[in-house]
Every structure is written in C-alpha cells, then in structure tokens.
Amino acid sequence: MPSTHDMDKIATLSDWSEYVGVNNERDYVTAYPLDECPYYVVAKTWYADEMHRPGCVWTHSLLIHKDDLLKITDFCNLLYLFEEPLTENYENYSTPRPFIEDAKETETQLSEIGENRAAEVYECLLSSTPSFILSEFTSRHSQELLLSLLNYVPVEILKNKSICSGTASPRSYDGQYLSLQLVTHDGNAVKYLSNKPAAPSSQLVGVSVVNNRPQVSSLIRHYQDELGDSVEKLSGFLNVVVLINRTCKDDEEKQQVLLEIINTLSETFPAKEDGRIFKSAVFQPSLARDLGGEENFLFTISTVDVSSFTKEQVDYEKRLRELTTAQFLQLLKQLYTTWKLNEWGIQTVNEVAQYVSYAEIADLRETDKTFFQTIICSSPELLNQILWSDFTKEEIQSTLSLFSDKDMAKAFKHWRELFKTMLNQKVPIASELARMAFSHDRTCVEEYLNYLNSEKHQPHRPVSRELERYPEAVVDWLSKRDSINWDVAYVLVNSIDEFSPWVKNRGSRIWMPLHNMLSEKDPIQFYIYLYRLSFNWQDKEALVYLRKAFYPIHELLVQDKLEYYLWYRIEPYTEHLFFWQNFDKCKKLRKMVVRRLKEAGCSKLALMNYTPDKQTNEWLLKEW
C-alpha cells in the first residue's frame, strides 16, 4: 500500500469496536473507501479469544478496486471470502482471494428484521449526515442487512459511503464518522428504529432486501451511470419503479399513476439528456398497456410538460403511426377537446395528415360531422384531398370558415374546384372569399366568368365587384369568347377600366362580343362604356363601336335626358366648340364622330345611313 494515510485508516478501523451482539457475538463487518488509493475496503472482524491481552481482534480486509465495485451484484456474497484464523498459518490473508459470485454460503434470512426497519436503515444509509442506529439484531443479521443494502446504492454514491454492522459507540477516522453504524450503547445521537413504513422508494428496497428479491438492485446497477452520485436521482428512480409496479383498481387511478410517473421523471431528470436510457425504458408500450392503453398514454404525453423529454425517448411519432385508424381518431378527438396541449400535441393536431388519409376520415361526414369539420380545419393536407363535388351545399358552407386563417388559405391548392362547386351548388360567396380565391388562383376568374356566361347562372354581385382587381385576367378571358350575355357585359362595364393598359394592348377585336350583345333595351351606361372604349384605337372595330354607341347617347342628349354624371364621362371625348356653342352637347358629340371618321379616311357617304334616324343623319352631314 503506497499510502501511509490509507494504511493507518485500515489499521485504525481494524481495531475492536467493543461490539458485543444480542447473543454475545463479537464479529462484525466494516466497509469504507480509502482516501488516497483507488480501493474500497470490506472487512470482517472477529474477537480473538485466544489472545491473552484483552481487546485483541482478527480483521480480514478485502481491498476492492473502485472500478470493480460494479462487478459485485451482491455484497453478501463476500461473506464467504472472510476466514477467521484458526491456525498459526496466516499466509492466506495476504493472498488475493478469487471471487465467485455464486459461491455464497447461504441465502440471507432477514424476515425477522422486517421490511419497515430495513427500509428505515436504508434511508439512514443514504442520509447526507452520519447515522447511528441502536442495534436490535444478531450479528449475522446485522452483517447481511448492511451488506445487502449496499446492493441498492449506485457505485458513485457507494464510493463515499461507509458502514459498520457492530460497534459499542460511533466510530470515526480523522474526525469523520462512518456513514451508517449499528451501535449497542444508547446515546444522544443514537436513533431507535420505529418499525413504521418509510417513504415508498425506501420501502421498495426494504421489501426487496427482506424477501431476497434482487430485481431492484439489478435495475439500480443497470442505470447507475444515469443516477451518478445523486441521492435525489436514486430516490426519484425508485419512486418511478414503485409507481410502475402499483396495482390500480380503476382507470382513474391508472391515469393518476401515469401522471405521477411522468412528473417524477421530469423532477428527477429535468434535462432532456438526463436519464435518457431510463426514460426510454419507462416509456415502453408495456407501460401504456398497464395504465389505460396506448391512446390514453399518447394523449397524456401530449398534454403534460415535456420539456424534460425528447420524442425519441418516447417513440412518440412511431407510436402514433402504429395506431389503428380508429385508435388515432379516438386520440385526436381527445386532443381536440382539451385546452392544455403541449408542443407535441399541437404538432400532432397540425400534422394529422401524417397519420390518417382523407379516405380514412371520409365516413365521418355522415357519422360525426363536427369532428370531421374539426379535422379538416386543422389540416391543410387533408383539406387538399377533398373532392369538393361530393360535398353538399351545407357541408361546403360549414367548411368555409377555416379560410379565415391566412396560413390555411395560403396552403389550400384547389381553389378553382371549390369555387366551381360553390357556383354550381349556388352557395353564397362573400366578397372576402372571392378575393381569396382570385388572389390564390387566377383561374377562378375564368371559372366565374364561364359560369356567369352560362345559361343556368346566378349573378354574385360581391364576386363581380372583386373582378375589378383583376382586369388582365378578365380581358384574357374575353379574348377567347365569341359571345357574352348581359351579366358578363355588366361585369365588364362596371369592373374594367376601358383605358387600362390591358385593354389597350389586347386590341379592339376582342370587344366585339360586347358590341354584338347590345340592344335598344340595354342601359345607356353600356353604350357610354362602348363609346369611351372606341377611343383606344383607330381601326375598323373602333369605328364600329363608335357608331353603335353614338345613336342611343345622342337620342338622350336631344331629349335632354342624359344625367350629368354620365355626360361627365363622355364630355372629354366630344369636340370642343367655341364658347357660344359649347352648351350644345349634341353638336359636340356629332362633331367628334365626324372628326374621327375623317381621321380614319372615311368619305362623307359613311354618314348617309349612319343612324336609324334620318334627321340625325342630316345633322351629321351638316357637321362635315
């Protein structure tokens, strides 16, 4: 031993503790770490009756490298290695002893100690302050109890723990008391065992020790790297094991236990990477089966604080995908009814399409309309799988509110199909919805104009008004038509600026359908629009539009029935006269017609039958 300090510690703690047991036994075990060398000492001491000098003892010390402590699954198995000197041959005591795990002498018999007292001693062992307990047990029971309890201490904690199974008074070295000592003499600091139930975590150890159940100690050793040197983590770990093994009488208790397990894990291992392996083991599907089923587990983990967990530890997304459609929908229904979804639950609700298809929820349209609408409203992907032509008018109307969400409207890809179905089924279309449809898919403009130009159409004035925002799309549609009806003409006249670049650049010919559909019964506004429109070009069609519009406008001027706001629209496109003639609106209009015909290279003969009225034609000829 290279350290004189450690040699002195071994020598000091090998001295007789003056222990005399309940049956006058005088053998006991001591275990403690060395301070400078990497060894943990487990020693057994016998009183040397054969010595003439009082107080002599034999102490057999086993030096176990601290890195090898994890290899010892049961410290009671060390007892068979200790050998009381019965001869004068002491060479065996300086020779390493082979440790054979299965070679222990007998099973421990600790039932006489009782589960409660074993649990209380365990709590004292883990205490941060030294504990002195009045010994009530035989020497053998004391040794087996303390060595058995060492099996339930993670190695990193054990490296700083020391015990003595028998001493007359508390023992210390270098001013430091051993962690746990069973003492035979009463004193102010000596603790009496109460035999009352301890905390659940300690009680679990007490039951395991007394009944020779090594499973819990095996678990502690398996996860000892995650427990480290933290007594708090060990306590939380054991509490989780207690909860997992609790027998629940009903679903309410199962739910409570599940919440306690999750909360205990969070408190014990608050960081995501703390206890990572243990968390994954706890969250295995077997836990869910025992505590309310997989859907209930996934619902619970979607509503609690999950800042201490990762989805990988829970296998969250994999387990969602492994649910049957019925199971997932049941879970989803629960998620929709709670207000305390965490980020996992919110993501699940927002990404429903990853777990079910539209075909799998289509039947809900008949069986649970509200639930169906809720699913669709939370999933753009499923919304995009809808065949809108299958929807009734009422179903469409109840779905439209979801488009008030800008993100949902942006993600929707089938505006034209929806818009067409709404038109065909005569679903009222608000201007806001029309604006969204036109802005997200310009082909909806074409769809609306096609519908409006059909025989069985029903005008939607709010929709028509929105078309003024899309003159290019309207003009493009018109360029592909040979004829239009009155309602389309109304849209053109009231929505399209006749002098916009899109109108001018597409040429005059595309406006012939508007010219052709006008009759004497049509509003004068249509003719004024056509009149103004003709000023965009100097070609044949422009003169045709001019001629068509001139006569109805002129007739109203002759009768002084053209309202001023309408005259205001055409006056800039009439001839400017001398101030003493400028009051004559009819003359101003006729002069402009004549001027345009002259500019186009037409002869005076073009005015002979320019209008159906002979008098008007004569006036025109005079203006030439």
Where does each model-flagged region fall?
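Extended, helix-rich scaffolding/adaptor regions
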Residues: 1-102, 120, 141, 157-163, ...
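Soluble, amphipathic alpha-helical scaffold/repeat regions
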Residues: 1-12, 58-67, 72-194, 199-246, ...
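Alpha-helical structural signal with a strong bias for long, charge-/Ser/Thr/Gly-rich
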Residues: 207-624
